[in-house]
Amino acid sequence: VPYSLARSGNRLVCTCEDMLTSHEELVSAWQVLQSIKTTNGLNSHDQWIHAAAGCGADERAVRDATDDWLVVDYLMRNTDRHYNNFGLIRDIETLEVRPAPIYDTGASLWSGELDVDGRDWFAKPFYTATGKPSALRQLRLVEDWSRFDLDALSDWPDEVAHELSRMRMFAPERLDAIRDQLTKHI
């Protein structure tokens, strides 16, 4: 899904075409997980994959889409991924399902945080029995790193800093810190 920046009133926002057609609906991961019996022995990540496949989604496509938003959330420091902002798209006529594209990354780029730093952070949605869920633990769930060309993102931190500077709401020092941390995340 191609995204672009636009102005909405007095705000700079990220926009895209509607990800749904008139005959599609979004089914949140929460709804998907509630519709399928829990399988003992599966961690919460694998439970999601199992449930989505049980609803008819292609398992490989779900795994890839999940990897995509896990990586994007880490790169952007998204602190608000939860079971209501990822899921499946279902065709209401054919009942075919596919993973939804990435959406709702509004709590990222250190928004709402005083310090822009490189510390790990509390991250959802997948919990573990071995400790507090964190961004680095979420990142370890990525199954296929060969799909990602992180070298292609070498200019991305500068582009982010430039776009944020257009809002004229950030001190240059904060923009520099965001740029530096994004570079380290890559």
What is each residue range found by the language model?
Residues E93-I186:
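C-terminal catalytic region of ATP-dependent kinase domains
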Residues L26, G41-W48, P157, L175, ...:
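Alpha-helix initiation and N-capping motif
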Residues Y3, C16, F86, P99-I102, ...:
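Generic structural hydrophobic/aromatic packing signal, biased to beta-strands
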Residues P2-Y3, E59-R60, E173-R174:
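Short, surface-exposed acidic
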Residues A29, W48-A52, V62-T66, V160-L164, ...:
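Generic structural signal of hydrophobic/aromatic residues within well-ordered alpha-helices
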Residues D46-L109, L114:
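Conserved kinase catalytic-core segment
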